[in-house]
């Protein structure tokens, strides 16, 4: 929606024409970008944060340079301390044990070069304060993202703001890791497709209306070939967070390294639901649904490839090594739906969907275990609830698979509790919460088998300016051409220029990340560099 205003010409020089956009050498200064929606265009400003202050123009977000201890249980200082403690525990679980025997000077030198060093800035954090909706009785929710500095053996350092959940890590788990007890480690992460602006609806919601009207939204088919700002920023942020965890685990060939598998949950089934609901309501044709399926399948392959390659690159350039795979736990359901839409022209029931999940394909045993631990009130009643429950299934899958294949008892060798790490946007905390509750039931059903589940939720440093609610690029997509201005209040073309999402990512996360994403978007057919913006 930018045709109503003539934007300035894009130039490389304008990316560095003011102090706010120059690289920062002071490690105590944090740089953020703030995106704003105007009537006919979007704009971005950069801000240096070096003292306690609200993030300019972002409602409910602040930066604390020096958190004072207020003594209250839910104060920012106490929450910050809990986050740092949780991250330290996760680091201890991942850190390779020392080799047994005497430690000479050569061993000390080798360990110093091969072991990453965690430095916690114990007083810096982002604070997210979410106000409840008007007339709601809900409480204000404060979330603390503590600053964590990670120096890796090779490659650039990692500077992140994270919120962590680790309630079920026990002292014995930390002792086991210190003593060298091996445990399987799996990292799960995910990403949505497109953005709600491009889709015209929110995938997790059902049939919706526009601004309270009674007319159901029928979205245009998502033909855009360009990666959205949300997709690019999520790939960058998740990749760097996972790189820190993977290198901490010593997967670069150091003694005592443990195998790490990274599982990417890129949705497909979840994006089939909305057009099928429109079809059932008699609002769209079979041809519309068929084309929608084709476009979603293509985007799934492209974004999965982009995220996989970005993570692999960030890990390898810091001396790590991981195995990355794309989840496919709902393959039996998606195959049935494709067959029904393209060949049979008849939609399966939810019972048909659950049947193929339980009895068809390589994931059937894990699905039987998963569905067996659900209460009757939790069992999916329609396709949308199956799709939403699949997010939880994928986080739990490594444990479900271990139980289903009886590898829990294996060859008799002692093994530590499996470690499952969910790395995701904080908006997906409900997936973690649901998975954690379901995993507790394993203790009763599986003779005490209780996998370790921890959550690491990195905060973005590219914020959207909204009246209320969480800052999110998925819901508030600024488009692919953005006006860079000198000040938040500026709505003038004077002294401004047009930048793209990758330019902003480069300013916040680094030129290397920008260049890598640029190459990978071209590789996977998601490049926005050579074509006009797709509205």
From Swiss-Prot:
It catalyses: L-tryptophyl-tRNA(Trp) + L-arginyl-tRNA(Arg) = cyclo(L-arginyl-L-tryptophyl) + tRNA(Trp) + tRNA(Arg) + H(+). Its EC number is 6.3.2.-. GO terms for molecular function: ligase activity. It is an enzyme of class 6 (ligase). It comes from the Eukaryota. A motif (Conserved DDXXE motif) lies at residues 424-428. The keyword NAD does not apply. Pathway: Secondary metabolite biosynthesis. The keyword Ligase applies. Residues 93-114 are annotated as: Disordered. Keywords: Ligase. Residues 105-114 have a biased composition (Basic and acidic residues). Arginine-containing cyclodipeptide synthase; part of the cluster that mediates the biosynthesis of a highly modified cyclo-arginine-tryptophan dipeptide (cRW). Within the pathway, AnoA acts as the scaffold-generating enzyme and is responsible for formation of the cyclo-Arg-Trp diketopiperazine (cRW) from L-arginyl-tRNA(Arg) + L-tryptophanyl-tRNA(Trp). Additional enzymes from the cluster then further modify the cyclo-Arg-Asp diketopiperazine (cRW) scaffold. Belongs to the arginine-containing cyclodipeptide synthase family. The conserved DDXXE motif is essential for catalytic activity. This is Arginine-containing cyclodipeptide synthase anoA. It comes from Aspergillus nomiae (Aspergillus nomius). The gene is anoA.
């Amino acid at each position: 929606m930018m045709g109503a205003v003539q934007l300035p010409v894009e130039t490389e020089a304008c990316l560095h024409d003011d102090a706010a956009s120059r690289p920062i050498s002071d490690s105590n200064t944090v740089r953020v970008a703030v995106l704003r929606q105007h009537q006919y265009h979007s704009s971005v400003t950069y801000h240096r944060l070096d003292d306690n202050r609200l993030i300019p123009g972002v409602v409910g977000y602040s930066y604390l340079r020096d958190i004072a201890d207020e003594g209250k249980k839910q104060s920012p200082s106490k929450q910050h301390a809990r986050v740092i403690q949780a991250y330290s525990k996760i680091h201890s679980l991942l850190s390779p044990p020392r080799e047994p025997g005497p430690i000479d000077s050569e061993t000390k030198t080798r360990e110093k070069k091969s072991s990453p060093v965690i430095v916690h800035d114990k007083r810096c954090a982002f604070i997210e304060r979410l106000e409840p909706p008007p007339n709601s009785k809900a409480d204000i929710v404060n979330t603390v993202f503590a600053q964590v500095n990670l120096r890796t053996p090779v490659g650039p350092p990692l500077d992140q703001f994270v919120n962590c959940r680790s309630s079920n890590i026990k002292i014995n788990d930390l002792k086991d890791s210190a003593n060298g007890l091996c445990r399987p480690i799996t990292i799960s992460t995910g990403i949505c497709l497109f953005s709600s602006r491009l889709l015209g609806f929110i995938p997790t919601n059902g049939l919706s209306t526009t601004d309270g009207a009674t007319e159901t939204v029928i979205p245009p088919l998502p033909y855009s070939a360009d990666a959205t700002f949300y997709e690019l920023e999520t790939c960058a942020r998740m990749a760097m967070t996972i790189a820190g965890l993977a290198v901490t685990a010593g997967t670069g060939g150091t003694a005592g390294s443990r195998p790490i598998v990274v599982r990417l949950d890129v949705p497909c089934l979840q994006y089939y639901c909305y057009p099928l609901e429109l079809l059932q309501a008699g609002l769209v044709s079979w041809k519309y649904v068929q084309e929608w399926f084709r476009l979603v399948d293509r985007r799934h392959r492209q974004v999965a490839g982009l995220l996989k390659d970005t993570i692999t690159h960030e890990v390898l350039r810091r001396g790590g090594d991981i195995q990355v795979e794309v989840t496919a736990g709902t393959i039996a359901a998606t195959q049935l739906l494709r067959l029904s839409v393209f060949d049979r022209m008849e939609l399966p029931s939810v019972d048909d969907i659950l049947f193929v999940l339980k009895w068809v394909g390589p994931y059937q045993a894990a699905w039987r275990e998963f569905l067996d631990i659900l209460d009757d009130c939790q069992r999916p009643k329609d396709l949308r609830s199956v799709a939403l429950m699949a997010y939880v299934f994928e986080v739990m899958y490594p444990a479900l698979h271990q139980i289903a294949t009886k590898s829990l008892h294996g060859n008799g060798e002692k093994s530590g509790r499996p470690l499952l790490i969910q790395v995701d946007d904080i908006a997906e905390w409900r997936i973690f919460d649901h998975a954690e509750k379901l995993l507790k039931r394993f203790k009763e059903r599986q003779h005490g088998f209780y996998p370790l589940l921890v959550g690491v939720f990195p905060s973005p440093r590219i914020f959207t300016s909204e009246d209320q609610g969480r800052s999110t690029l998925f819901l508030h997509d600024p488009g692919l051409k953005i006006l860079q201005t000198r000040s938040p209040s500026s709505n003038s073309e004077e002294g401004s220029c047009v930048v793209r999402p990758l330019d902003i990512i480069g300013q916040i996360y680094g030129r290397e990340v920008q260049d890598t994403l640029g190459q990978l978007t071209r590789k996977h057919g998601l490049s926005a560099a050579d074509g006009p913006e797709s509205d």
